[in-house]
Amino acid sequence: MEYFAESYDVIVIGAGHAGIEACLAAARLGVKTAVFTINLDWVGNMPCNPSIGGTSKGHLVREIDALGGEMGKAADKYTLQSRMLNLGKGPAVHSLRAQIDRREYSQGMKHTLELQENLDIRQGEIVDLYRLENGEWQVKTKLEALFNAKAVIIATGTFLGGRVYIGDVSYESGPDGMFPATELSKALKKLNIPLRRFKTGTPSRVNRKSIDFSNLEEQDGDEETVPFSFETQTPPKNKVCCHITYSNEKTKQIILENLDRSPMYSGKIEGKGPRYCPSFEDKIVRFKDKERHQLFIEPCGLETEEMYLQGLSSSLPEDVQLAFIHTIPGLEHAQVMRTAYAIEYDCVDPTALNATLEFNSIKGLYGAGQFNGSSGYEEAAAQGLVAGINAALKIKGEEPMILDRGGSYIGTLIDDLVTKGCTDPYRMMTSRSEYRLVLRQDNADVRLTPIGYKIGLISQERYDKFISKEEMVKAERERIEQKSIPLTDALQKIMEDCGTTPLERGCKMIELLKRPQITYKALTSVDDDRPDLPRAVFEQVEIAVKYEGYIKRQEQQIKEMRRIECKKIPADIDYYSLKGLRLEAVEKLSKIKPENLGQASRISGVNPADIAALNIILETL
């Protein structure tokens, strides 16, 4: 029998990485919030790789932290191994990645939610969702409890209509054998929300004691680690070692001989999988000429012997999985603890949302994470944070927070989703940003902490520390501009050791730093009045000096982009009544409802002539 339970300002459906950031942001902004999850024991679960960060994903985590989110702090707390990726390339693509103790991370996040003021955390499946006459929302649990809310955030991950595939076997399920959310999809369809099917997958887990490590390549963490969070004072320590192995011709042969048993190739799986994280069988088919594929063996935690086989995602039958795993060096006698699987799930066409992640035509309803068509924990957390912030700001009657492409990867991610949409699970990459030299992970605080402070997620104490750091950066920049370094044998030795041309005379320190081969640290012995500065300070100074010309060029491009973004488009504009626009442009603009001229210019099917015509029309309105 139905009964009314309680009213909230914000209800979040799902307590994965998107749901966590959404409910914490809303609660911390002072609105009464509840988060519902199917299983309280797996809040913030990592059903796929036990890691956070990576190329471009590390940028997202830093940005989440700079705005006042939780993921970076939790990742630092439960890090098993830390590595900075792409150090052989420029600073724009340097990305932090950490192996995480997945169970500890989940339990730690659950405790964070439990302690948060203004937040209730509840175990229960939401089976229905509808609008009340007063404009508020009502959700119904499987146990027939009714809850009201002014705003609802859907962050269902891969649970929504989840179905697992392993060879010929398929069944309704969420990730890691949990219950799926089967009823909510029906409620969303009643609201005319455009759902489609995507799929993702995960590799097998094997028992550590059954692995032969004797011939495997070790992959250690960095000697000098750095944290994700700008608040973490002590860098995390490396506690484990990862290992590298490779597939071979025998592995390939088994895969090719059993492709007809793959649900992906037999047509049983209809959902579109992630383009940049294909299953192992898909890699074998796509790259038939490749003799071997690199695989990583990664621990799942300190209190478990489960090892994650990164790169071996599969939906082949269990017997085939065992056969090809046992062809791989080090895994000849591996005992599989969890079988790899593919999971198909419902998600929304993200062009139905606007830049606040609220639905265009359904007020008070927001989407976040894999529900929006993205893939990855970090992408999900970023969207959850934005949805939670904007839901709370709207309830408080304040202006929304909209991040643009020139200020963050989060803004790029959301703009791509709501403007361009996606035909397969969207993954963030540094190449998706036009301004990546400005959007580095080291300066995420410079770009976003003032926004987090203005909104109310950054404390006064943290903001004061940020200002202090900025003052140190400015002072050190001024010092090296004035600092003269005389020509000495010691300086010439540094030039020689760094592989750059010798000097004919002494010069300013800033001129030395402009040389690509010379680092700030390399000049320590000839910089006699150098202050003792944190790594984060001198690295920011060094990058700004070395890439000054390129950075200024991108900053000018961002100014031009923002000039166009300032031309707002009325929400009630009728494109069909406008003259000078092609029919395709009218249809796309009417569907996506861009908020400004810049967003309109990025819509597929809207060409420069359409934008020029629209610009003229806007000036007459």
Where are the regions a protein language model picked out?
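Conserved N-terminal/central alpha/beta ligand/cofactor-binding core
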Residues: 3, 24-132, 143, 155-172, ...
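Beta1/beta-strand and adjacent pyrophosphate-binding region of the FAD-binding site
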Residues: 4-18
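Core beta-strand elements of the Rossmann-like FAD/NAD(P) dinucleotide-binding domain
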Residues: 6, 142-151
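An anion/pyrophosphate-binding glycine-rich loop and adjacent beta-alpha core
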Residues: 57, 84, 186-322, 419-492, ...
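Glycine-/small-residue-rich beta->alpha transition segments that form the dinucleotide
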Residues: 151, 156-160, 316, 329
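A glycine-rich dinucleotide-binding beta-alpha-beta segment and adjacent secondary-structure elements
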Residues: 308-374, 402-415, 534-588, 593
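Internal hydrophobic alpha-helix adjacent to the cofactor/substrate pocket in enzyme cavities
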Residues: 380-401
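Extended, charge-enriched "interface" segments that sit outside catalytic cores
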Residues: 432, 438, 449-612, 616-621
